[in-house]
Amino acid sequence: MSAAKEGKEKKPVATVVKIVEVESVSPSKDKRPTRMKLLNNLSASSPQTYPPKTDKRSGIKGSRIKILNEDVLVAPKVEKRRSTKPTSPGATATSTVKILNEKRIVPAEETALETTKIKISPPKRNKMDHYVLQPVKVENNKSASQATRGATGEDEDTIAFILGDDDEVVPASTSRSNGQEILVTEEEEEEEEDDLDEEGDSPGGSNKNSGHKAIKEIVEHVCGKCYKTFRRLMSLKKHLEFCRYDSGYHLRKAECWKNLEKIEKDGDVLEKKDICFCCCESYDTFHLGHINCPDCPKSFKTQTSYERHIFITHSEFSDYPCSICNANLRSEALLKLHEEQHKSRGKPYACKICGKDFTRSYHLKRHQKYSSCSANENDTMSCKVCDRVFYRLDNLRSHLKHHLGTQVVKKPEYMCHVCKNCFYSLSTLNIHIRTHTGEKPFDCDLCDKKLSALVALKKHRRYHTGEKPYSCTVCNQAFAVKEVLNRHMKRHTGERPHKCEECGKSFIQATQLRTHSKTHIRPFACDMCEEKFKTEKQLERHVKEHSRQKRPYFSCTECKRHFRNTAQLKQHMDAGDHSEKSGEKPQRAKRSSTKVLERTDCAICDKNFDSSETLRKHIRSVHECDPDDIFGIQPPSAKRAKINKIPKVDEEEEEEMVPVALNASSGSLISSQTDDNGVVVREFLVDEGDGTAQTITLENETYTILPLDGEIAAEQITDEGVKVEGQKTPPKKSPVVKKEKRKSLGASLAAAIADNIEVPPVEEDFEGEVLTEEDLKLKENIAKLIDMLADPPILKKYGWPNAPEEMVLCKVIENCGYDLNKGAENYAELDYGSRMREYCKLLFTVVIHNDSIKSLLNNFPIDDVIEYVLGDEDQDEDGADNGEGN
């Protein structure tokens, strides 16, 4: 009996597999699942068992399987009870076929069939590697497939699986025609044999008592980290290289698939409450980046993005670090792929108009449609209320809130725990907190500067690259930052929104108002008295005065003189000098505290700044000039102080002169008395021909100047404090000195003067004339003009500064090609002041070709033009002092 059973087991058995039913579920828009039910139906002629592994490999290896139409083998009754549902869009009805072994087919039938060899492409098999197969039990129903299987007496167990994502996989049974032949490779047969062996070893592999064969179970390879299943071991190994084992992404995804119906019901309820059914958080926090990384200052909007950042950036594997970012990869292949993504991820989409780069084409299209780079005017959106034009829809919506009165309000939940300031969003709060912590994670790649925000880094890099994308529509001046352009536009419109509540003065910037408010606040108060000060240094100096007054002193009983210590008092008592003069308390010499008030407005572009240091930076960077050339920091008193010139007199008449000096420290006049008991206040040398008396005003008192006897040819002594009546003061000019015009004048003069000139020796033809006060002032201005316009090496060739101003000025004019001998007779008849004025006119018209100076000469006197070119610095500083006091 045993030998007979073994003989039966060794016989090859025909395996019949029926594809009873193929259902196609209508695909949805997002996900198109295809559900197929497979059934293994074994032959019911006699109970059979699977042949051994070795026999099957030797008998079936390399065999071909033919698909025959079931109409030949199945009775018509079964055909009537079958389902009439279409299998696919390409097939009209479901056909049931039988798959028989090639060895059991009659040769005559084989020749009658048309066969076609089809080679299955490997990519289609690989597509199913990443889908999870889940067994689903189907309830008993009275279908045609059940009736067929009931006749054979087999149990029913259906395995259904869903093909996710957007890949559409069409079942092979619906796409093949009847009688087609499939070529099965050796690798596939070995995998099928392994599956059959595992099925035979399983407890449910055979059930001899019941007489029914159990359904074959598909054995999958499961990832032990994320619990994802695979049909092949090679697919599992590839998956392990990319598996994000430290995140719960796969677990949550598998849980969602198991409880899909429950999640959909819960999602409908949560959607009404504005809560996401996936993360159970409010939709208000989706765009806020509320998930912060504990290892770096980055924040993320979703949990998935955060987990991906943790896996890539803060991974524990350090064998293959990325040279571009901080990511650490597991293998060299992954590192190469990661670095290629860096290159391809750059910003491949660029705007052809402004050159701005984008990572996605959608961002570029949005930029081209809703920005100033739009080619069509129809892309702009205007407000229906005020007709204001916008390029982006979100900007228009925020603008409409101003009309509706529903402006965005700072939320208290975004409050800084340090300074208690509230912000609109969590991202702005995170940037603000870095100002307290001092954290600056963004480094500039062009300098050593670090910034606290990425937006600030982008603005900072524009100063290195010279990019100025924002230009003024009025004056065409370009700016690197849009905020600076908005502030600049207020100069054209005259808008000054920041107004001081104390004095009513308005400013363009809030920083200017804060600086100005310090003049009214005086926050530093003295504890010993009621005085208040603007700065802490002023308070410290004031406190020192209090401490100095509290110092102990020792006084003399006879003269009431005070001393700091007993040694000085004893020395005073031993000397015995108790006179009234010695008893007086010595007056402390007052310190000459000269306060230098520097200007804060640019002399070239009329811009105002908060401090002089900011103005200096502006002059260096924008105008490329030396700030000291634009405005000086020398004290006004030092500029007003001038050295009195000693007049040249003959030795015979030297005794007749009465010297008079002015004591600047005491402020009083040192006078001398004449023979007729008259007080000589000041002597002035006047021309002999002028016999009339002149009146002068000296320190608010009027004095009479009498002519001296004798002929004295010398220069007249003048002082700034003396003002001669009857003379016209020059008209006031604007305090803003145009530095650019000075530079152009100096360049023109330097180009006009030749370097290789032979200068004659200094002559004394210009001496011996009596100069008036106006002539002396003109002479001094011409000397300044020569120093300012000409270079020192060139002036040194002309004998400057030892040579007279008139001679140097004439040599400069003659060297430029103008012959002064033509009008020598006319110039000889003029006095000193008239000659120098004519020479200056020739200097500005012949030597220096400047249209603006020529226009000034047509409208103003030459003296005013010279002062305009030089710049009245004293008047500028006085105006700055008055502006600061206001």
Swiss-Prot record:
Molecular function GO terms recorded: DNA-binding transcription factor activity, RNA polymerase II-specific; RNA polymerase II transcription regulatory region sequence-specific DNA binding; zinc ion binding
Chief localisation class: nucleus
Tree of life domain: Eukaryota
Compositionally biased residues, Acidic residues: 184-201
InterPro entries cross-referenced by the UniProt entry: Znf_C2H2_sf, Znf_C2H2_type
Entry GO CC: nucleus
Keyword 4Fe-4S applies: no
Region (Disordered): 24-62, 167-211, 571-594
PROSITE patterns: ZINC_FINGER_C2H2_1 (PS00028), ZINC_FINGER_C2H2_2 (PS50157)
Cell location: Nucleus
ZnF (C2H2-type) ranges: 221-243, 291-314, 320-342, 349-367, 381-403, 414-436, 442-464, 470-492, 498-520, 524-546, 554-578, 600-623
Biased composition (Basic and acidic residues): 571-587
Record key words, sorted: DNA-binding, Metal-binding, Nucleus, Repeat, Transcription, Transcription regulation, Zinc, Zinc-finger
PANTHER family according to UniProt: CHROMATIN-LINKED ADAPTOR FOR MSL PROTEINS, ISOFORM B, ZINC FINGER PROTEIN
Annotated function: Component of the gypsy chromatin insulator complex which is required for the function of the gypsy chromatin insulator and other endogenous chromatin insulators. Chromatin insulators are regulatory elements which establish independent domains of transcriptional activity within eukaryotic genomes. Insulators have two defining properties; they can block the communication between an enhancer and a promoter when placed between them and can also buffer transgenes from position effect variegation (PEV).
Protein name (Swiss-Prot/TrEMBL): Protein suppressor of hairy wing
Organism: Drosophila ananassae
Upper taxonomic lineage: Eukaryota, Metazoa, Ecdysozoa, Arthropoda, Hexapoda
